[in-house]
Each structure stands twice: as structure tokens, then as C-alpha cells.
Amino acid sequence: MDIANLIQNLKQTLQNASNERHLIELKNIFVKQHLLPLYDELKKSDNKKEMGLLINEFKQQIELITNQALVELNNKSDQIDLKKWANKTLFTPFIKNGHHHIINNIIDDIAQFFKKLNFEIVSGPEVVSPVYNFDHLNIDENHPARATADSFFINSVQMLRTHCTTTTAQVLENNPHKDIRIMSFGNVYRKDDDDATHSHQFNQVDFVWVKEGLTVANLKWLIDSLIKYLFGQNLKTRYRLSFFPFTEPSFEVDVQCFKCDLKGCAVCKKSTWIEIMGTGMLHENVLKAANINDIKTGMAFGVGIDRIAMLKYEIDDIRYLYSNNFKFNAQIK
């Protein structure tokens, strides 16, 4: 029995198959003619072991050749001759390309800044416990934000977060013995009436850095570096003492108006300064709530991404950022 010659004949036969069903039929005919009779001969053979091995090898080669032929047949059916059917004169409607939203672009820019400083970029749940939204952040029971008139409560133990600092509180609690460098971002919710400068939902970036030896000087250096990175200018900054429950001391950060050359304009409301973010050193009660060693100090800031977008691109109505107006979105890439 010349197996090599039979296999060669099978290859040539299967090349004539017009489709998968035809190919299987040709294979079955070959098996019936050349493989099955060998089993009858095996019964009469004096050397059943040797002949059995030969038959098994023959069977495996038949399956291998059939599978190869099937792959080749499928490849042929996938090849389309474009010249035969393509109509180059056929009208194709213009498809407008999409691009990242400016909110996403600014978040990406800030994330890249912090990645260069080895900060971890994290995000947390938007539905949180008041424990993390208020209690662990030194916001007492009489604070106005805890009222249902100012915050969205789902029930007594769940609410929509009013700031991304909730993620900070959870990270601090889960890593009390580590130096912490994180930037968190996401949607936050407050019961504001929607108008040109307010929205019940907006985007925020929050950062926290905890280790031994951090001071206000480190905080100022970091924020000044971020502002320069975002706006591409050596803008002057001003730190005004303020109050936030979770930081002490607390500051409002202003930048010198970059639109009017200190002449006063609509962007800075004629003051030549633009309020841009709140910041400060983490309050000792926030660190205690997370069981962090009192030797360590921490600093944090929170900034509204929507506000940064409005300042950077001179947008006078925050609602443009959410209106899905293609003409508006196409102007800013």
C-alpha cells in the first residue's frame, strides 16, 4: 500500500471542492474507497500490530489533509475581487470624525502631570456613605452640606458624593501606614439650580499627598507647577486664607487674569484675579479618622474641571459643556 501516493491523490481531489459540503463528500468517498477496506484486511493479517499502526497513520494524514484543504477553501471564499464589484462613482456621505471632549482632555492633562510625580490615579464610587462624605472629613452634623436641601440623599446611609474627597477618605483609611500620593477624579453632585455658572452635576479632580515633613511650601510649589502646566504661562498666584472643614490652614487660590493684561475684563470680573481652586493642609482630625500617625502631614486640593475648561477656553456658560451641541464641540479640540 503506497500511502504517500494515496495522500497526494486526496490533495488533488479536495482541490476540486466547490464548497465545504462538497469537500466533506469527497473526503468520505476517499475514506470509503481506500481506508475502510484496510480494516477488513487487518482482520486477516498475520501482523496486526504493524498494520494497525499503518492504518492509524493513514487515518491521521487524511484528517490533516482535509483540515488544510478546508482552511484553504475558506480563505478563497474570503478573498473578494474589488475590481469586479466596486463602484468608484457611488456617493458616500461625509462622515464627521469624533474627538475627545474637552472635560476628558483636561482630566488627561492633569493626570499626566501627576503621573510624572509618581502619583497613583484612582476613581471611586459616586454613591457613598455619609461617613466618607462628611464624618471622616471633619464635617460636623450642623454643616449646611448635610441638609437634604443641599445634597442628594438616596436614604439615610447612601448619598451621591458632593466631592471627590470621599475617595481620598477611603484611600487614607485603607493605607494608614503608607506614604500616599493619589489623584482622584469623577462626577460630583450638589443641589444647585442649573444656570450659566452652576450645575447639579459637574466634574472634579482631588489630590492628596501624605508623608512626613510636608509643609505649605510643598503645597504652593505643587499648585504653582500645575497651574503653569495647564495654562502654559508663568501666571502669578495668590493664596487667600479661607476655611474648609478638612484642611487647616485652608486657602483659596487665585491666578492673575491671563486674558486682560491686568486691565480688568469679564473673565476676572474686573478684579484682575481669577479664583481657581481650594486647597490646604489636611486637618489633624481627617488623619486621625484614618488612623494615620500624627508624625505625618498631608496636603490636598479640589478643583472643578468644568471651571478650568470655562477659563481656559473662555466659555461663558457651563451648560455648553453638556448640551451635546456639535457646532460647539467642533470648535474646541
UniProtKB/Swiss-Prot annotation:
Enzyme Commission number: 6.1.1.20
GO molecular function annotation: ATP binding; magnesium ion binding; phenylalanine-tRNA ligase activity; tRNA binding
Pfam families for this protein: tRNA-synt_2d
Compartments reported by the entry: Cytoplasm
Swiss-Prot/TrEMBL catalytic activity: tRNA(Phe) + L-phenylalanine + ATP = L-phenylalanyl-tRNA(Phe) + AMP + diphosphate + H(+)
Alphabetical UniProt keywords: Aminoacyl-tRNA synthetase, ATP-binding, Cytoplasm, Ligase, Magnesium, Metal-binding, Nucleotide-binding, Protein biosynthesis
Comment on bound cofactor: Binds 2 magnesium ions per tetramer.
Gene3D superfamilies linked: Bira Bifunctional Protein, Domain 2 (3.30.930.10)
Keyword check for Cell cycle: no
Binding-site list for Mg(2+): E248
Membrane-crossing segments per the record: none
Annotated GO biological process: phenylalanyl-tRNA aminoacylation
GO cellular component: cytoplasm
HAMAP family: Phe_tRNA_synth_alpha1 (MF_00281)
Membership in a protein family: Belongs to the class-II aminoacyl-tRNA synthetase family. Phe-tRNA synthetase alpha subunit type 1 subfamily.
Official protein name in the record: Phenylalanine--tRNA ligase alpha subunit
Species, as recorded: Ureaplasma urealyticum serovar 10 (strain ATCC 33699 / Western)
Lineage of origin: Bacteria, Bacillati, Mycoplasmatota, Mycoplasmoidales, Mycoplasmoidaceae
